Amino acid sequence: MNKMFVCLSVLAVALAAGGCRGGASAQQKQDLSHMNARQRDKVGYEAAANLRRTELKEDADTRVTNIRYRASDDTLVYTLMLKKISSPEVFNAVQRRKLDVTLHKEGRKEVCRNRNMRDLMIHGRYSVEYRVLARNGKALSSPIRISAKDC
């Protein structure tokens, strides 16, 4: 159960990158919704670069190893490493499935709770994806993809 808490806490740390919960103004929402694909890509690359400068950090349990923008589907991709879990093999099949379900559920809940992130996804048509890795670099769960339809 302690490992589950660590996994959920890393997700909360990663989701803090979304900023404050104030939300976008009406003008910002309109600007986001009127962007074409090239403009969305430019903003996405700039956002990923800014997030890399401010959010690539490390604490006792987690490390945000990379934040990048994937232009093919307008997605900000976070790569997180849980330092206390050496390998996915420490979980049996039932525990891994439960971990996967919990990470997906909590991830969607936290991202959708944040107004800025929700506005960015709904009006800007962006998505967020989290890849959670063990200390050895192997995936702990399937990628957690959150889009506007999840909110």
Residue ranges and their predicted role:
Residues 21-23:
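Bacterial signal peptide processing site
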Residues 59-84:
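Short edge beta-strands and adjacent turn/loop segments
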Residues 29-49:
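Post-signal peptide N-terminal segment of mature Sec-exported envelope proteins
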Residues 86-114:
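Long, charged/polar, surface-exposed segments that mediate recognition or autoinhibition
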Residues 17-19:
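C-terminal motif of bacterial Sec signal peptides marking the signal peptidase cleavage site
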